[in-house]
A protein has these predicted regions:
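Bacterial Sec-dependent N-terminal signal peptides
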Residues: 1-22, 246, 252-254, 259-260
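Short loop/turn motifs that connect adjacent beta-strands in outer-membrane beta-barrel proteins
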Residues: 19-31, 53-61, 93, 109-120, ...
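Flexible, solvent-exposed coil segments and beta strand-coil junctions
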Residues: 22-30, 76-87, 166-175, 228-230
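Residues that define the transmembrane beta-barrel architecture of outer-membrane proteins
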Residues: 29-33, 40-44, 58-60, 95-99, ...
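Residues on the lipid-exposed face of transmembrane beta-strands in outer-membrane beta-barrel proteins
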Residues: 37, 46-50, 101-107, 126-130, ...
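N-terminal, post-signal-peptide region of Sec/Tat-exported proteins
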Residues: 44-77
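Outer-membrane beta-barrel translocator/channel fold
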Residues: 65-100, 104-115
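Outer-membrane beta-barrel transmembrane domain signature
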Residues: 123-209, 213-241, 254-260
Length: 260
Protein backbone atom coordinates (compact mmCIF):
# COMPACT_ATOMS: atom_id res chain seq x y z
CA UNK A 1 0.00 0.00 0.00
CA UNK A 2 2.86 2.37 0.84
CA UNK A 3 4.35 1.69 -2.60
CA UNK A 4 1.09 2.74 -4.26
CA UNK A 5 0.99 6.03 -2.30
CA UNK A 6 4.61 6.69 -3.23
CA UNK A 7 3.90 6.15 -6.94
CA UNK A 8 0.85 8.43 -6.79
CA UNK A 9 2.92 11.18 -5.17
CA UNK A 10 5.55 10.98 -7.90
CA UNK A 11 3.02 10.78 -10.75
CA UNK A 12 2.43 14.60 -11.10
CA UNK A 13 6.17 15.25 -11.23
CA UNK A 14 6.48 12.61 -13.92
CA UNK A 15 3.72 14.29 -16.00
CA UNK A 16 5.25 17.79 -15.75
CA UNK A 17 8.70 16.48 -16.54
CA UNK A 18 7.34 15.10 -19.85
CA UNK A 19 5.50 18.30 -20.90
CA UNK A 20 8.45 20.06 -22.59
CA UNK A 21 8.78 17.13 -24.98
CA UNK A 22 5.41 18.05 -26.48
CA UNK A 23 6.60 21.48 -27.55
CA UNK A 24 8.29 21.73 -30.96
CA UNK A 25 11.33 23.96 -31.09
CA UNK A 26 11.63 25.76 -34.45
CA UNK A 27 15.05 26.16 -36.03
CA UNK A 28 16.16 29.73 -36.73
CA UNK A 29 17.86 29.51 -40.11
CA UNK A 30 20.60 32.07 -40.77
CA UNK A 31 20.49 32.11 -44.57
CA UNK A 32 17.87 32.14 -47.31
CA UNK A 33 17.83 32.37 -51.08
CA UNK A 34 15.05 32.37 -53.65
CA UNK A 35 14.50 32.81 -57.37
CA UNK A 36 11.08 33.36 -58.87
CA UNK A 37 8.74 35.07 -61.32
CA UNK A 38 8.10 38.82 -61.25
CA UNK A 39 4.81 40.21 -62.57
CA UNK A 40 4.14 43.93 -62.55
CA UNK A 41 1.64 46.34 -64.02
CA UNK A 42 3.92 47.28 -66.96
CA UNK A 43 5.60 43.97 -67.74
CA UNK A 44 7.04 40.76 -66.34
CA UNK A 45 10.35 39.05 -65.64
CA UNK A 46 12.20 37.32 -62.82
CA UNK A 47 13.62 38.21 -59.44
CA UNK A 48 16.10 36.82 -56.93
CA UNK A 49 16.99 37.48 -53.32
CA UNK A 50 19.75 36.47 -50.87
CA UNK A 51 18.77 36.95 -47.23
CA UNK A 52 20.59 36.88 -43.89
CA UNK A 53 18.80 36.65 -40.54
CA UNK A 54 19.86 39.31 -38.03
CA UNK A 55 17.59 38.02 -35.24
CA UNK A 56 14.13 36.53 -34.78
CA UNK A 57 12.39 39.65 -36.15
CA UNK A 58 14.80 41.32 -38.57
CA UNK A 59 16.50 40.24 -41.79
CA UNK A 60 18.58 42.03 -44.39
CA UNK A 61 18.94 41.05 -48.04
CA UNK A 62 20.40 41.75 -51.46
CA UNK A 63 18.06 41.47 -54.43
CA UNK A 64 17.77 41.82 -58.18
CA UNK A 65 14.90 42.13 -60.67
CA UNK A 66 15.05 41.66 -64.43
CA UNK A 67 11.84 42.66 -66.18
CA UNK A 68 10.36 44.13 -69.32
CA UNK A 69 8.93 47.66 -69.19
CA UNK A 70 6.06 48.81 -71.40
CA UNK A 71 4.66 52.26 -72.01
CA UNK A 72 1.13 52.60 -70.55
CA UNK A 73 -0.21 53.52 -74.03
CA UNK A 74 1.57 50.73 -75.87
CA UNK A 75 -0.93 48.69 -77.97
CA UNK A 76 -0.15 45.80 -80.31
CA UNK A 77 -1.56 46.03 -83.84
CA UNK A 78 -1.36 44.19 -87.16
CA UNK A 79 -1.58 45.06 -90.85
CA UNK A 80 -4.97 43.59 -91.80
CA UNK A 81 -4.28 43.84 -95.56
CA UNK A 82 -1.99 40.78 -95.35
CA UNK A 83 -3.03 37.48 -93.78
CA UNK A 84 0.54 36.55 -92.84
CA UNK A 85 1.52 39.94 -91.37
CA UNK A 86 3.26 40.05 -87.99
CA UNK A 87 2.04 41.90 -84.93
CA UNK A 88 3.90 45.00 -83.74
CA UNK A 89 3.43 48.03 -81.49
CA UNK A 90 2.82 51.06 -83.69
CA UNK A 91 4.80 54.08 -82.57
CA UNK A 92 7.17 52.08 -80.37
CA UNK A 93 10.72 53.40 -80.57
CA UNK A 94 12.58 51.11 -78.19
CA UNK A 95 12.06 47.74 -76.60
CA UNK A 96 12.91 48.28 -72.92
CA UNK A 97 13.84 46.06 -70.03
CA UNK A 98 15.19 46.99 -66.62
CA UNK A 99 17.66 45.52 -64.15
CA UNK A 100 17.29 46.47 -60.49
CA UNK A 101 19.92 45.73 -57.87
CA UNK A 102 19.57 46.82 -54.27
CA UNK A 103 19.63 46.29 -50.52
CA UNK A 104 16.66 45.87 -48.20
CA UNK A 105 15.33 45.01 -44.76
CA UNK A 106 12.59 42.59 -43.78
CA UNK A 107 10.55 42.66 -40.54
CA UNK A 108 8.48 39.77 -39.17
CA UNK A 109 4.82 40.66 -38.58
CA UNK A 110 3.26 37.24 -37.99
CA UNK A 111 5.11 33.95 -37.58
CA UNK A 112 3.79 30.53 -38.52
CA UNK A 113 2.19 28.59 -35.67
CA UNK A 114 3.64 25.16 -34.92
CA UNK A 115 0.91 23.43 -36.92
CA UNK A 116 1.53 25.43 -40.12
CA UNK A 117 0.06 28.57 -41.61
CA UNK A 118 1.43 31.74 -43.19
CA UNK A 119 4.59 33.63 -42.29
CA UNK A 120 4.03 37.35 -43.00
CA UNK A 121 6.82 39.92 -43.26
CA UNK A 122 7.04 43.56 -44.33
CA UNK A 123 9.84 44.44 -46.74
CA UNK A 124 11.49 47.64 -47.89
CA UNK A 125 14.39 48.06 -50.30
CA UNK A 126 16.20 50.58 -52.46
CA UNK A 127 18.89 50.53 -55.08
CA UNK A 128 19.96 51.30 -58.61
CA UNK A 129 17.92 50.71 -61.78
CA UNK A 130 19.51 50.13 -65.18
CA UNK A 131 17.23 50.61 -68.21
CA UNK A 132 18.31 48.97 -71.47
CA UNK A 133 16.65 50.37 -74.60
CA UNK A 134 16.94 48.46 -77.87
CA UNK A 135 15.72 50.28 -81.01
CA UNK A 136 12.73 48.78 -82.81
CA UNK A 137 13.26 47.40 -86.32
CA UNK A 138 10.30 46.74 -88.60
CA UNK A 139 9.70 44.98 -91.90
CA UNK A 140 8.55 47.66 -94.38
CA UNK A 141 6.62 46.91 -97.57
CA UNK A 142 7.74 48.49 -100.85
CA UNK A 143 6.36 48.07 -104.36
CA UNK A 144 8.61 47.71 -107.36
CA UNK A 145 7.88 50.45 -109.93
CA UNK A 146 8.45 48.12 -112.87
CA UNK A 147 6.98 44.76 -111.82
CA UNK A 148 4.52 46.14 -109.24
CA UNK A 149 5.55 43.29 -106.94
CA UNK A 150 5.91 43.85 -103.20
CA UNK A 151 9.18 43.32 -101.39
CA UNK A 152 10.24 43.78 -97.77
CA UNK A 153 13.07 45.82 -96.27
CA UNK A 154 14.11 45.70 -92.61
CA UNK A 155 14.47 49.24 -91.26
CA UNK A 156 14.80 51.00 -87.93
CA UNK A 157 11.47 52.58 -87.07
CA UNK A 158 11.37 56.31 -87.72
CA UNK A 159 8.08 58.13 -86.97
CA UNK A 160 9.07 60.88 -89.43
CA UNK A 161 9.61 58.50 -92.35
CA UNK A 162 6.60 58.67 -94.75
CA UNK A 163 7.06 54.97 -95.54
CA UNK A 164 6.65 53.93 -91.89
CA UNK A 165 2.85 54.08 -91.76
CA UNK A 166 0.39 51.39 -90.61
CA UNK A 167 -0.37 50.63 -94.28
CA UNK A 168 3.25 49.93 -95.25
CA UNK A 169 4.48 48.18 -92.08
CA UNK A 170 4.37 44.41 -92.59
CA UNK A 171 5.36 43.61 -89.02
CA UNK A 172 8.13 43.41 -86.49
CA UNK A 173 11.64 42.32 -87.44
CA UNK A 174 13.73 39.85 -85.43
CA UNK A 175 14.21 40.91 -81.82
CA UNK A 176 17.97 40.48 -82.20
CA UNK A 177 18.13 43.14 -84.91
CA UNK A 178 19.52 46.30 -83.33
CA UNK A 179 21.11 44.72 -80.25
CA UNK A 180 24.40 46.41 -81.10
CA UNK A 181 22.63 49.81 -80.85
CA UNK A 182 21.29 49.27 -77.34
CA UNK A 183 21.41 52.29 -75.01
CA UNK A 184 21.71 52.41 -71.23
CA UNK A 185 20.06 54.81 -68.80
CA UNK A 186 20.59 54.81 -65.04
CA UNK A 187 18.21 55.62 -62.21
CA UNK A 188 17.08 54.36 -58.83
CA UNK A 189 14.17 52.58 -57.20
CA UNK A 190 12.24 52.24 -53.94
CA UNK A 191 10.18 49.16 -53.09
CA UNK A 192 7.76 48.35 -50.25
CA UNK A 193 5.63 45.24 -49.90
CA UNK A 194 4.34 42.30 -47.90
CA UNK A 195 5.69 38.77 -48.18
CA UNK A 196 3.47 35.74 -47.48
CA UNK A 197 5.46 32.52 -47.00
CA UNK A 198 3.35 29.33 -46.81
CA UNK A 199 5.66 26.31 -47.27
CA UNK A 200 4.83 23.32 -45.06
CA UNK A 201 8.52 22.53 -44.54
CA UNK A 202 10.56 25.09 -42.61
CA UNK A 203 13.66 24.79 -44.82
CA UNK A 204 11.69 25.41 -48.05
CA UNK A 205 10.56 28.82 -49.35
CA UNK A 206 7.24 29.07 -51.13
CA UNK A 207 5.90 32.57 -51.06
CA UNK A 208 3.89 35.31 -52.73
CA UNK A 209 5.03 38.91 -52.32
CA UNK A 210 3.05 41.95 -53.39
CA UNK A 211 3.70 45.67 -53.18
CA UNK A 212 4.66 48.78 -55.11
CA UNK A 213 7.85 49.97 -56.83
CA UNK A 214 8.85 53.50 -57.79
CA UNK A 215 11.58 53.81 -60.47
CA UNK A 216 13.04 57.24 -61.27
CA UNK A 217 15.45 58.17 -64.03
CA UNK A 218 15.93 61.82 -63.15
CA UNK A 219 18.29 62.99 -60.40
CA UNK A 220 18.04 66.68 -59.54
CA UNK A 221 17.37 69.55 -61.93
CA UNK A 222 20.66 69.28 -63.79
CA UNK A 223 21.95 66.23 -65.62
CA UNK A 224 25.35 65.45 -64.12
CA UNK A 225 25.88 62.65 -66.62
CA UNK A 226 24.98 63.55 -70.18
CA UNK A 227 24.87 59.92 -71.35
CA UNK A 228 21.78 58.84 -69.50
CA UNK A 229 20.80 60.20 -66.10
CA UNK A 230 17.98 62.70 -66.22
CA UNK A 231 16.61 61.68 -69.62
CA UNK A 232 13.14 60.34 -70.32
CA UNK A 233 12.93 56.71 -71.37
CA UNK A 234 12.17 56.98 -75.09
CA UNK A 235 9.81 54.03 -75.39
CA UNK A 236 7.10 55.52 -77.64
CA UNK A 237 6.75 58.24 -80.25
CA UNK A 238 3.57 60.25 -80.82
CA UNK A 239 2.96 60.39 -77.06
CA UNK A 240 4.65 61.69 -73.93
CA UNK A 241 7.37 59.58 -72.38
CA UNK A 242 8.24 59.55 -68.68
CA UNK A 243 11.37 59.29 -66.59
CA UNK A 244 9.62 57.84 -63.53
CA UNK A 245 7.33 54.83 -63.16
CA UNK A 246 5.05 53.68 -60.35
CA UNK A 247 4.10 49.99 -60.65
CA UNK A 248 2.35 47.30 -58.64
CA UNK A 249 4.17 43.96 -58.48
CA UNK A 250 3.76 40.32 -57.47
CA UNK A 251 6.73 38.01 -56.89
CA UNK A 252 5.99 34.28 -56.95
CA UNK A 253 8.51 31.84 -55.44
CA UNK A 254 7.67 28.15 -55.66
CA UNK A 255 10.48 25.92 -56.92
CA UNK A 256 13.79 27.69 -56.22
CA UNK A 257 13.81 28.74 -52.57
CA UNK A 258 15.54 27.31 -49.51
CA UNK A 259 16.77 28.10 -46.00
CA UNK A 260 19.87 26.79 -44.28
Amino acid sequence: MKKIYFILLLFPFFIFSQEPLKKSEKILYKNERCLGVNLHSLGWGMHGRRTWNDNVRWQHFLEFDIASLKHPKQIKTINTFFSNAKGYDYGKLNSTFILRSGFGKQFLLFDKPDFGGIHITAIGSAGVTFAFLKPIYLEILYQDDITNEFYIETEKYNPNDPNHTPYSIFGRASYFTGLNQMQLQVGGYLKVGLNFEYAKKDHVIRSIETGVIADAFKIGENDFLKNGIGKELQIMSLTKNKNNFFTFYININYFFGKKW
